[in-house]
Amino acid sequence: MAVVKVAAIQAKPVGNDLTHPGNVKHALELLRKCVQMDDEVRVACFPEYFPWSGREELAREAEEFGIYVIAGIAERENGALYNSCILFGPDGSILGRQRKLSLGSMERKYFGFTPGRELRVFDTEFGRIGIGVCADLWGPPNVGRQLLMLGAELIFNPSFFFVLRDVWHCLLLARAVELMVPIVAVDTAEFPFRLGDRVFRECGGLTCIVGPPWRDMEEFASWWHGARFNWFLGWLGTEEGILIRELDLDRAREFRKAWFSRIVGRENPWVAEEAARG
């Protein structure tokens, strides 16, 4: 059975600075705390941009604890700077990276990031992981669909919200229902974010895990006929913290099949559309 425990680490940047060198040490401390809280955690995810650097240190820590780690790293390649989320394997290797596709004006102007070019999914022993970096997932609807077409069974959404924070949960809920895939959405803790001469104070927080809430197909059927269920499987406030939940990907797959079969008459409409295009 594909059951996996995931941890969403809502980290506060050292000195209220996303690029602070001390973020690496803080990330390692939070990883250790995460494993101490629950040694059955298999995937730990940090927010977008966090800890900004520290690939070697994170790889060593992932290997020491034998877990998957997703971390926000600013990567330079061939003269270009990318907003990357790197997936470290439990053996300390880099299994892959997802570079953000949809860059806002802040990222282009202040950080000088270059957009990524492709979406990927990553195989693990419990299922395929997809990563939609911040607006890539909750903004353009095609990204979530493409991840599903690539076989994603669990989607992580490392994010950094210094605007639009209050609508994030609405957008995540829409994606979770549309795709019928569990989403682990991770923001920084709240801190005053300085951007040029401006300071954004309602910045960060509200990390959550959202996904199919039913325990069995009987509950799914009751929801279909009007029963109410809370899709938010857990959430944090604005302080630094760690959210841990167990997700059953086999059960989610069963619900997904039933959902698409009922609303469009086939298991995955986007896969069918892509096949029809040839």
Regions found by a protein language model. Give the residues of each.
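Active-site catalytic loop in hydrolytic enzyme cores
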Residues: 76-153, 159-174, 203, 224-231, ...
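Active-site metal-binding loops of divalent metal-dependent hydrolases
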Residues: 11, 49, 136-137, 160-161, ...
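Active-site-proximal beta-strand elements of phosphoester/diester hydrolases
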Residues: 3-20, 45, 128-136, 156
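Conserved hydrophobic/aromatic beta-strand scaffold that supports enzyme active sites
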Residues: 8, 87, 97, 119-121, ...
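Conserved beta-strand and immediately adjacent loop positions that scaffold enzyme active sites
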Residues: 5, 70, 84, 118, ...
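C-terminal beta-strand edge segments of enzyme domains
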Residues: 121, 189-278
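Cys-nucleophile CN-hydrolase/nitrilase-fold catalytic domain and related Cys-dependent amidase chemistry
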Residues: 14, 18-99, 161-181
